[in-house]
C-alpha cells in the first residue's frame, strides 16, 4: 500500500537523526518496517474492513477512533483521547526526544454514501453513510505505518518521538484545524500524510482553501393560507440567497467552488417557515480569493435578509488555507 512510502520516510528521518551512517542505517530500519507491515497484513485488512463497516460521519467516529486507539495501546503507544475538545480526536506517542515525527490518520465517512465492497453502486444500507473517500484505508494505513516505524525504532535503537494524530471530521475540514489552533502540532519536526488513490505515487500538488459556514434566517411563522401577510419566510431568504450566489458564479475564477445544501427549510408547506438554514462551502486555490468570495456570498445573504425582512446570523465552522507543499519532503518520499 502507498502508506509504505510514508513509513519509509518516517524511518529515514529517524535514522538520519540518530546515525552518522545514514544510508546503511536507514536501509536496515526500512526493511524492518516493511517486514512489520507485511507481517501485520491480515490484521490491518481487518481494521480497514471494520472501519469501512462502521462508516461514521465526522465528529461521530466513536467506534473507528476506539479501534485505532486500542491497537495503538496494545502496541505500547501512550494515547491521549478526546484532545482539543473533540471526543473522537486523539494523539498517540512512542519514543522520546528529537526528531518528533507526526503521522496523520483520518477515519470519517460521508453521509448517504453507503457502499458494499464492489465496483457497482450497491449500498450496504440505503441512505446510510459510507467511505466514498477511502478514509477507512487512510486511517488503517497510518496505523500500519506507525506500528512499523515503532518496530524499527525498537530494533535499531533509534532516537526520536513518533506521534499518530487521530484527526476527525476531515470531510468538513474541522479536526486538523481545531487541533492546530489548540497547539497540537507546535513542536513537530515533520508531519506525514497519505491518501488512498487509484495509483501509487507521490502527490506534489496542493488543495483548495475553504471556508465552511451556515447562514440562518429567522422570520415569522404564520398560516400560509389563512394569513400569509403576517409571516416572514426564512425559506424565501435562503432561496433568494442561493439564486444570488448562482448568478455570482459567472464572475468567479475557474478554480472557485461554491457548494451549498439547505439543512432546514421549514416543517410544513402550510406554515410560513420561521427559520431556515443553508450550509455553504466556499473554495478556491488561494485563501485570499476565498476571503473575497465569502464576503461576496455574505453580502448576498444580507441582501436576501433585507428583501425578506428576516434576521440573518452566520456561523463559520472552519476556515482553512490551501496546502503548502513541502518539495524537499516530497522528493524524499519519491526517492524512497
Describe each model-derived feature in a short phrase:
Residues 131-140, 228-236:
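Short, conserved micro-motifs enriched in small and acidic residues
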Residues 18-131, 140-160:
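Acidic/His- and Gly-rich active-site-bordering loop/insert found
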Residues 1-16:
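Fungal secretory targeting signals
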Residues 186-336:
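Midchain, well-structured core segments that form catalytic/ion-binding scaffolds
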Residues 51, 92, 103, 135, ...:
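Divalent metal-coordination and catalytic microenvironments
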Residues 56-57, 165-169, 317-322:
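Conserved short loop/turn motifs at secondary-structure junctions
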Residues 137-207:
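Acidic/histidine-rich catalytic neighborhood of metal-dependent amide-processing enzymes
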Amino acid at each position: 500500500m502507498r502508506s509504505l512510502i510514508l513509513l519509509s520516510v518516517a524511518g529515514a528521518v529517524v535514522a538520519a537523526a540518530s546515525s552518522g551512517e545514514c544510508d546503511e542505517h536507514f536501509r536496515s530500519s526500512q526493511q524492518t518496517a516493511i517486514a512489520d507491515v507485511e507481517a501485520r497484513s491480515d490484521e490491518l485488512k481487518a481494521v480497514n474492513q471494520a472501519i469501512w463497516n462502521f462508516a461514521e460521519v465526522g465528529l461521530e467516529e466513536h467506534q473507528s477512533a476506539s479501534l485505532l486507539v486500542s491497537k495503538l495501546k496494545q502496541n505500547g503507544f501512550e494515547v491521549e483521547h478526546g484532545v482539543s475538545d473533540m471526543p473522537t480526536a486523539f494523539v498517540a506517542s512512542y519514543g522520546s526526544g528529537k526528531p518528533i515525527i507526526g503521522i496523520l490518520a483520518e477515519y470519517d465517512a460521508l453521509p448517504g454514501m453507503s457502499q458494499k465492497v464492489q465496483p457497482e453502486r450497491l449500498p450496504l444500507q440505503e441512505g446510510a453513510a459510507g467511505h466514498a473517500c477511502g478514509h477507512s484505508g487512510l486511517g488503517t494505513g497510518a496505523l500500519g505505518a506507525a506500528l512499523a516505524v515503532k518496530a524499527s525504532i525498537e530494533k535499531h535503537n533509534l532516537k526520536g518521538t513518533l506521534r499518530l494524530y487521530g484527526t476527525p471530521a476531515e470531510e468538513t475540514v474541522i479536526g486538523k484545524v481545531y487541533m492546530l489552533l489548540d497547539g497540537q502540532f507546535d513542536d513537530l519536526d515533520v508531519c506525514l500524510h497519505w491518501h488512498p488513490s487509484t495509483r501509487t505515487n507521490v502527490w506534489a500538488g496542493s488543495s483548495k482553501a475553504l471556508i465552511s459556514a451556515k447562514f440562518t434566517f429567522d422570520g415569522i411563522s404564520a398560516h400560509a393560507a389563512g394569513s400569509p401577510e403576517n409571516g416572514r419566510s426564512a425559506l424565501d431568504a435562503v432561496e433568494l440567497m442561493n439564486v444570488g450566489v448562482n448568478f455570482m458564479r459567472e464572475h468567479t475564477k475557474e478554480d472557485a467552488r461554491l457548494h451549498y445544501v439547505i439543512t432546514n427549510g421549514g416543517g410544513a408547506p402550510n406554515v410560513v417557515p420561521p427559520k431556515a438554514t443553508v450550509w455553504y462551502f466556499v473554495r478556491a486555490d488561494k485563501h485570499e480569493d476565498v476571503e473575497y468570495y465569502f464576503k461576496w456570498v455574505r453580502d448576498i445573504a444580507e441582501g436576501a435578509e433585507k428583501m425578506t425582512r428576516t434576521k440573518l446570523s452566520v456561523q463559520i465552522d472552519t476556515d482553512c488555507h490551501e496546502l503548502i507543499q513541502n518539495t524537499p519532503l516530497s522528493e524524499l518520499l519519491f526517492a524512497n
